[in-house]
Amino acid sequence: PMTDQKTYTQTPWSLKDLYDSFDDPKYQETFDEIKRGVENFQAYREQLSPDISEDLFIGMITTYEHFYRLMSRLDGFVQLAFAQDTQDQEAQAAVAKVDQFQAEMSNRTLFFNLWWKGLDDKNAQRLLDASGDFRYWLVTMRNFKDFTLSEPEEKVINIKDVTGVRALNMLYDSI
């Protein structure tokens, strides 16, 4: 038996759950909120020590998680907008802006990753035991400690990736 065939008109997906547009004030405000979060996080640098309290440590990584989620939202928005139309100049510029912003923010919080990877196993285990849902992320980060460079070198790599690998990938995606 034949069934009735229906025709559907393809429409672009809506990104309004993230932001209304690149001109959306909330989109612009997210950059500022991330900057404030990173500045607050940087204040923890002086408090990092092997005997840091579990509560302070959890507070730190909760702060980190908050601005990281915001960064993921920004990145998701620009990447989806770009995927919608790889020839869209505004989307291309937004991807480049967010990539650069991510590298800058990553460089400003890199101290934590390096401290965590360099922490002795006994204190790392103590903090892992208190870390709850953050445990997997923290364990994964420590797995890369043998492949981690100094802070200045890691910062150069972050910036290089924006103009190197990521820029090349974007070029290929545009073609």
Annotate each PLM feature:
Residues 2-175:
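A well-structured
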